[in-house]
Amino acid sequence: MRWLISMRYFLAHKRQTLVCIAGVTISVTMYIAMDAMMSGFSDKFIIETVESSGHILVNDEPRETQTPILQKVYTNPNSLIAIRGVKPREHVKKIKNPEGLMAKLRRLPGVTAAAPEVTGEVIVSYGTKTITVAIVGVEPEQQTRVTTIGDKVVSGGFSRLRSTADGLVVGYGVASVLGAQLDDTITLSSSTGGKTTARIVGIFQTGVTPVDYSRAYMLLNNAQTLLDKKNIINRIILRTDDYNRAEAYAKQIESIVAYKTESWQESNANFLKIFKIQTIITGFITGALLVVAAFGVLNILIMAVLERVNDIAILKSFGLSRTDITFIYLLQGVAIGLIGSAIGLIFGKITIEILRTIPIQLEGLVKADGLLMSERPSQYITAFIAAMIAVTIAAVYPARRAARYDPVEVIRGAH
């Protein structure tokens, strides 16, 4: 009986009910579509960055800065002898015994591969164009084990670094800015006075703008000579069995080795903060829409209660309890939430598929030929639960208000 009465009241205000359902539908659809879009761009950035730059970086910086022994002894204010103006000994930053360290790292649980790098900034010139590029000296065979940069080469080949004495693989953005093409010869100059010419043997495109527009690869020996870092390795790249656990692995590795170790999350912390802010903004927008939809439900149920005060009194006089009356009106709110959420889930799926087909060139933090949509079951579940909670809470007040009416007082007031 309670179900029949509730559904009868539910259908009594069709126009207002449809508006409330539409509000819930729009909120759910918007959340699913916006979250899929934000997740698509963040997933693209994370995957491409991780795959092209490695999971963990072991840098040439010591884990702790050592205080010179003379400074410890003779700069004490209570000491009889004091030394001022002590100049620290010039220290060449490098990783000591890199081959031995890499062999040790490869044996650690979770580490699947390790590769040496020497890095530095150089000025690249081609014709009248000049830009600053981060040069990375690598051993091609080892580099392709820790990153997928070889698979990102869209013109030429990464393996040509080995077969070409002066070979250079540059990012798509670097080549575009310079106006250079495959097999063109460009000039590289370092701040230490090193200068050389190199032939472009490959052009890679990861889709991540900071990488494509600022990075170039050359043979390890050639880079060491150019940067005046002969026989120096200043970075070791590690690949793990699960990049999501890179932070935990990095902490373990740093406690073992004497060098600062960064996970990809730490290296890209600023970019990850941007994506977190975007997620928060998405939540605020869809949350605001849900609040509006909830107020719509609240409004229509209050109107329904006020219009049917006499009916409520009659129902109570026939033996319906407060719980029954509460159930009747609460069920109407739940019905609006269920129908609106269900339609919203369907529309959300349709919206994602439509957005995927839109031909649009995007070039910002991530370069793409269309909108990147990342679809997860959690998006649908979250949207459904949030909508149901919001609408149900909105229905509680009018339902309890209806249950509090005293049939005797209502009948007296009616006369």
Would you name each region that the model predicts?
Residues 342-383, 396, 400-404:
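Short helix-loop junctions at transmembrane helix boundaries
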Residues 38-132:
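Hydrophobic, regular-secondary-structure patches
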Residues 62, 174, 182, 187-282, ...:
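Mechanotransmission and gating elements of multispan inner-membrane complexes involved in transport
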Residues 90-94, 98-199, 225-226:
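Short acidic/glycine-enriched loop/turn elements at secondary-structure junctions
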Residues 14-41, 276-311, 334-343, 389-393:
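Hydrophobic alpha-helical transmembrane segments of multi-pass inner-membrane transport and secretion
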Residues 401-415:
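Short cytosolic juxtamembrane segments of multi-pass membrane proteins
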Residues 302-304, 310-356, 382, 398:
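Transmembrane alpha-helical interface segments in multi-pass membrane proteins
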